[in-house]
């Protein structure tokens, strides 16, 4: 898994608070257990005018031409509330989002996002409002996220965010739970060699 250090990307301004996981990925699309293929169902009930997902809703922000190819999602408080389905970050990541910025996230959704190599950034409501205003006024312009410096640069303004150092280390180095375990492979092998035969 590639490490995440910096990203410059377009921002989708989702001007809504309390966006729950059922809105992010509706329950009828949860049958699969692999992480791919969910992006086409992201925000399905808002994004499409029909059940089959063949008629895009032109009034939903994800369908606006100027936000196509965006890699950063901007939202209001309590993003990812509701049920704990891991399919929600799967859908966001499969669509192409790598960073989410909001004043707050539901705890389980926040942790699931980090586990799926996405960066959820908490900023104050005032800072998020400033970024919304900038994005609306600057169609097609990118912002810059620097995980090493823990900053978000929007125009000529720099915002600082916090992230648990362990989580930051994992993202910077592209480590998931398996990767973390393999860092201790030599110690694990040495331990296994010393296990009594009756315990093997």
Curated annotation (Swiss-Prot):
GO cellular component: 3-isopropylmalate dehydratase complex
Biological role stated in the UniProt entry: Catalyzes the isomerization between 2-isopropylmalate and 3-isopropylmalate, via the formation of 2-isopropylmaleate.
4Fe-4S found in the keyword field: no
EC number: 4.2.1.33
Pfam family, one: Aconitase_C
Gene Ontology MF terms: 3-isopropylmalate dehydratase activity
Enzyme class, UniProt record, top EC level: lyase
Keyword Amino-acid biosynthesis annotated: yes
HAMAP family from the UniProt entry: LeuD_type1 (MF_01031)
Pathway: Amino-acid biosynthesis; L-leucine biosynthesis; L-leucine from 3-methyl-2-oxobutanoate: step 2/4
Reactions catalysed, as given in the entry: (2R,3S)-3-isopropylmalate = (2S)-2-isopropylmalate
The protein, known as: 3-isopropylmalate dehydratase small subunit
Quaternary structure and interacting proteins, as annotated: Heterodimer of LeuC and LeuD.
Source organism (scientific name): Haemophilus influenzae (strain 86-028NP)
Recorded family membership: Belongs to the LeuD family. LeuD type 1 subfamily.
One annotated GO biological process: L-leucine biosynthetic process
Keywords: Amino-acid biosynthesis, Branched-chain amino acid biosynthesis, Leucine biosynthesis, Lyase
Classification via InterPro entries: 3-IsopropMal_deHydase_ssu (IPR004431), Aconitase/3IPM_dehydase_swvl (IPR015928), AconitaseA/IPMdHydase_ssu_swvl (IPR000573), IPMI_Swivel (IPR033940), LeuD (IPR050075)
């Amino acid at each position: 898994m590639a490490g995440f250090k910096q990203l410059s990307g377009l921002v989708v301004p989702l001007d809504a608070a309390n966006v729950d996981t059922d809105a992010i990925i509706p329950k009828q699309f949860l049958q699969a257990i692999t992480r791919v293929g969910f992006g086409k169902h992201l925000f399905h009930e808002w994004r499409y005018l029909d059940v089959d997902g063949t008629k895009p809703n032109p009034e939903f922000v994800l369908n606006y031409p100027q936000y196509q190819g965006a890699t950063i999602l901007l939202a209001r408080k309590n993003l990812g509330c509701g049920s704990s389905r891991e399919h929600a970050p799967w859908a966001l990541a499969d669509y192409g989002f790598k960073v989410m910025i909001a004043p707050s996230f539901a705890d389980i959704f926040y942790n699931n996002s980090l586990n799926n190599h996405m960066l959820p950034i908490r900023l104050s409501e005032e800072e998020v409002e400033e970024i919304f205003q900038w994005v609306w006024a600057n169609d097609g312009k990118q912002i810059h996220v620097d995980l090493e410096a823990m900053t978000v640069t929007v125009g000529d303004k720099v915002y600082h965010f916090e992230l648990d150092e362990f989580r930051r280390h994992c993202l910077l180095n592209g480590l998931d739970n398996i990767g973390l375990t393999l860092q201790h492979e030599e110690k694990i092998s040495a331990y296994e060699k010393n296990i009594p035969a009756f315990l093997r």
